Amino acid sequence: MLYTNEYKEQLILKHKQQHWGGGVASKSNVIYAHALGLGVNKILDYGCGAGDFKKAMKSDPWKSKFEISEYDPGIHGKDELPNVHDYVVCVDVLEHIEPECLNDVLAHLALLMRVGGYFLISTVPAFQNLPDGRNAHLIIEPAEWWEKKLSEKFELTTHYIAEGACAYFI
């Protein structure tokens, strides 16, 4: 199970209240370089929020060569389960997954990813809450925990840890 119906309702409400997904646009240079080096064509922004990553990539002639798809269960029109892509981007998403669904989501991501990907994960509480009052980051774990968890499904090629976040190239 990728999410519960109750949580999907929380996501829909939250997306109506607030613009989510802005952080990934600032990572477009890093993602571009990694994806280009892997020779990919199709990129999936999994948990795309408002779609700022796709907008950032399409606004730059060098980056616009990629075919970019978006998936977010909380946004009508972006909530269809995606097909396999060469590369999967997951920025500020995994910490929002319901803990009981995380293993299924990681397995799903592994099936969707043909060549590689980029995951950026916050390790601290969010500044926002869900409409039901819970912190928007449902999983708050240190980088070491995430590295172990991701290593169960992916071959991590590079990672970096900063205060409050960790990033992994696959």
Features from the language model and the residues they span:
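A short His-aromatic
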Residues: 96-97
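Conserved N-terminal segment of class I S-adenosyl-L-methionine
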Residues: 1-87, 103-107, 112, 123, ...
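Short hydrophobic-acidic sequence motifs that mark active-site Asp/Glu residues
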Residues: 70, 90, 118
